[in-house]
Amino acid sequence: MNNAVGYAKPTERSNKILLGTDGIGADMIEEARIAYARLREFNVSAEPTTVWQWLENSLELFPDAKQDVVSFDYDFADSPWHAAFTTNMNVTDVEIAGEKVLTNSQPTRVDLQEVRAKANEQALRLYERLS
């Protein structure tokens, strides 16, 4: 839906559907919530379980992800129905292949202050070149 790519009415085709993101948002629960709302535009009887299956189908591309652990600040984030009707469910912790990469909503592998400082330096440098 971003970048004016449109909406393909995915349930009208027989091929397997996977829900993903092009990186602009990268919030897959929010993408699923929006996909469910869009699905209901042309099928009012559609259920969130359809879209949830699209999320699960993506695990076929990344089977190792089945072992990863993702925790949310909402107790029922693993429910298709709750995910479809609840906004602002935030990831709090992520463990990938036994390594904690997000703890208390903060990355563990990078220093955010350093990343932001370097990004600011580069933005100023670019601005100077463009001026």
Language-model features, listed with the residues they occupy:
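Active-site-adjacent C-terminal substructures of enzyme catalytic domains
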Residues: 1-77, 85-86
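Active-site microenvironment of metallo-dependent hydrolases
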Residues: 37, 53-131
